[in-house]
Amino acid sequence: MTEIVAVRGREILDSRGNPTLEVEVVTAAGFVGRAAVPSGASTGQNEAVELRDGEGGRYGGKGVLRAVANVEGELAEAVVGMDVTDQRALDLAMIEADGTENKGRLGANAMLGVSLAAARAAAEYAGLPLYRYLGGPGAHVLPVPCANILNGGAHAANNVDFQEFMVVPVGFESYREALRAVAEIYAALKKLLAERGLAGGIGDEGGFAPDLSSNGEALGLLSEAVERSGYSLGEQVCFALDPAASEFYEGGRYELSGEGRSLERGEMVDYYVRLCGEYPIISIEDGLAEDDWEGWEMISARLGGRVQLVGDDLFVTNPKILRKGIERGIANSILVKVNQIGTLTETFETMDLAHKSGYTAMVSHRSGETDDTTIADLAVAVNAGQIKTGAPARGERVAKYNQLLRIEESLGEAAVYPGLGAFNPRMREG
């Protein structure tokens, strides 16, 4: 009944209108799991390889028919006949079939599609929601949403250097109430931008993307939107940043072109320290470039005791790279993107290493998304306590938020909303 009998792939579109991969895994008993693979705009140089066709004419070379062929060819050969409930064996079989360190031969997108679809088929067989199948009886913590409601950098066509400005609803009793606060702040920000005559267009992740004079101005707008919504800044709602600093790191300096400034690493760290003194910032992701480990050591020494420092491009959901960071004492949290590593098994291994080492983990979407809601279930399955999946706008973002509402409802009184407690313990002890 649990034997895999077929694996199918197809090319679909993501939220940016680019092709991506969807995979179905079918069992002998007729259970079907379907999963769609996301894609990023700002990517770490050590991420597992996303296989694209590279043909100049078709979709500008971004087609995924090669990945589809690999799903239905070598990867199907590797897993057909296997037990769909043996996730680790399935994933290891695909890793062995690929035979490369970065999954560049068959494609991390192809492998991830099979990995996630198999998990969904197994959950269907077990008659369990995905979060319960993956996490077991202990899965009960709803994640705090880090909602990107102002976009810049690679996610928007504006002059703002930092990529994401997020509101974080920490002072609420339930996920439902926290999400309501995010939606109300988003609406207040929309009205505020209109009053100021600032463009109301939105970026890839649903946040507004106005031209602003500085990153500080963006935080000022968020502050006013929070206060207009009737919430207490610093108590009920805090901020998180994702500068995506690798995107503006050139020649050993941080080029804040929107502000007309060029900073060395020490000055960049000073800049963050100043912002954290002016605003209730509890998390900074990729504040330094992924290859500026000296800069990461500096910011970890200066802010690591009171601010969550998240490695995204720095760690790329890779346990080997994370282990190096732990040994050097840099960052205190990891962003988890399943397509950075390419299988569910390796994702769990990375998160387990993080938690055992005192690092928190924030489960994340990508800028190129679909209506697939796997990451919502994943966040609850591992009791991550944090999720980043964009603004409360655009269907592919709202799909994840709404899935979490359903999960909270299904958990009933067992559901826990951790608030500030989800963020790095060392930060709170500092």
Curated annotation (Swiss-Prot):
Gene Ontology cellular-component annotations: cell surface; extracellular region; phosphopyruvate hydratase complex
EC number(s) given by UniProt = 4.2.1.11
Q: Give the residues the record marks as binding (2R)-2-phosphoglycerate.
A: 163, 337, 366-367, 388
Record key words, sorted: Cytoplasm, Glycolysis, Lyase, Magnesium, Metal-binding, Secreted
Pfam families per the UniProt record, alphabetical: Enolase_C (PF00113), Enolase_N (PF03952)
Just give the chief location class. Answer: cytoplasm
- What is one process in the GO biological process aspect for this record? glycolytic process
Q: In which pathway does it act?
A: Carbohydrate degradation; glycolysis; pyruvate from D-glyceraldehyde 3-phosphate: step 4/5
In terms of InterPro entries, this protein maps to: Enolase, Enolase-like_C_sf, Enolase-like_N, Enolase_C, Enolase_CS, Enolase_N
Residues annotated as binding Mg(2+) are 242, 285, 312
Q: Where does this protein reside within or beyond the cell?
A: Cytoplasm; Secreted; Cell surface
Q: Which GO terms describe its molecular function?
A: magnesium ion binding; phosphopyruvate hydratase activity
Q: Which cofactor does it need?
A: Mg(2+)
According to its UniProt record, which residues of this chain constitute the active site? Answer: 205, 337
Q: How is the cofactor bound?
A: Binds a second Mg(2+) ion via substrate during catalysis.
Catalysed reaction, written as an equation: (2R)-2-phosphoglycerate = phosphoenolpyruvate + H2O
Quick check: keyword Secreted in the entry?
yes
Q: What does this protein do?
A: Catalyzes the reversible conversion of 2-phosphoglycerate (2-PG) into phosphoenolpyruvate (PEP). It is essential for the degradation of carbohydrates via glycolysis.
Q: Which family does it belong to?
A: Belongs to the enolase family.
What is this protein called in UniProt? Enolase
